[in-house]
Amino acid sequence: DALNICASELPYTFGDYTFDESTVSGNYEVVFPASNGCDSIVTLDLTVRQEGSQQNEFSGTWDWFSTYIDDEHTDVFAELKEGLSSYGKVIKSNTKFVNYSGGVWSGLLDKIENEQMYMVQTNMPQQTSITGCVANPEDHPITIKNGWNHIGYISQYSADVNDALAGLNVTPQDGDIIKSYRDGFAVYFES
């Protein structure tokens, strides 16, 4: 069995076994006692993820947003809306959106996913912070479709385009474009 937990969730109880704050990632044998004396032993592949805080700066117009805080452990959407407060106007994905009016967010967008990129419109510059368990990119495969894709960037660190795209299961085609909101674009050319 495999289990992913955030360091902030420690101590964590699994069956009759409690993992304390000093627990690190690894394999653990956990015994499940049985009343008939035939105890079950499970080897648990435990991953303890670090906690992080993502700082976001919104310009007062439209900005791109994605997150490396794991959407499985943290309600990123609630934290983003709370951080934007009354300065937020619209949060939109490729297919859904919510807008802020009269003190209420309304619309069909109901979750922020690590695999996706979102557009956020604010009515003035705003900084937000989202705290939670840092996502493992391997747990969040990104699907690329024909046409434009709003793909999330699931890393705390900057990387060049080739390294950032290395984990995607995609073969670039001549003329494919990757575009940033502010920092330009890159075009793939077969050599």
What are these regions (language model features)?
Residues 1-52:
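Proline- and Ser/Thr-rich low-complexity, intrinsically disordered segments
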Residues 49-191:
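N-terminal exported-region signature
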